[in-house]
Amino acid sequence: MNRFLRMTAVVLAAAFAFLLTGCGGSSASTSFTWFVDNIPANLDPQVATKAEDVIACENLYGGLVRRNASGELVPDLCERWEISSDGLTYTFYLKSGLTYTGTKGAATDYAITAEDFVYAFRRVFDPQTASPYAVEFSAIQNSAAVLDGTADPGTLGVSAIGELTLVFRLSERDDTFLSKLTLPGAMPCDEAFFESTRGTYGLSSTSTLSSGSFYIYNWTASGLFLHRSAASPLVNNLRLVQNTSNTDKSAAQLIADEK
């Protein structure tokens, strides 16, 4: 992932932090339409890099940490974290009882556990994934050897202790590591669900699970329509529609497309 792309992701995340926390207060502000160059096509967070895909992933997936409206890193799916004195070990304690959300807000039996993050990072460093996020997390122990196929994925410096404790071991200090955990590539991935999609993970509404504030309500040729998991005075309905084909559509037409 190059510097430009990384900055794009940061800017998009900041923009949405402002949008989703700064627009509340009235029912008129509970829906937002974002016109993008292309309708999102790939919502696999370990490979998503196009701007419209990153925008969607930033809202569909919750990770270990997130940035609040002030730009500070705060816990998201974890209760807290600890960093060793030498800066080489990061330990996260996940919240209990969390589950993924399916299409149209359907409840699922897929629990969010530490193993989901382990699997996500093994995917990042799987040569077959060709994840652009591998370079961002190159400080993780044995990441280079796993990526080039000379080491077993089980030796990667990401491990689970029980269901709710996740440990990262770095080969060198990286003071930006926490910040990088907000990138799409660091979002959790349930291995059983991933395998069940048979190569279509993140390519359709039925092959995508949400761990974040929004879930997929509909995904059509007209756009990607997201609804917030829990109603709030903030933006509750987010529409990502193509700029070139939808700029002349009325609000009523967009709502009709959403359904």
For the regions a protein language model found, what residue spans apply to each?
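Bacterial N-terminal signal peptides that target proteins for export
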Residues: 1-9
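C-terminal motif of bacterial Sec signal peptides marking the signal peptidase cleavage site
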Residues: 19-22
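Bacterial signal peptide processing site
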Residues: 24-26
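Short, well-ordered beta-strand elements
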Residues: 29-41, 89-93, 117-120, 166-167, ...
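N-terminal lobe/hinge region of extracytoplasmic solute-binding protein
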Residues: 35-85, 209-210
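Aromatic- and charge-enriched surface segment that lines or borders ligand/interaction sites
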Residues: 79-136, 253-257
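Surface-exposed binding/hinge segments that line
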Residues: 116-118, 123-192
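Gly/Pro-rich hinge or "lid" segments in bacterial periplasmic/extracellular proteins
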Residues: 155, 163-164, 169-242, 249
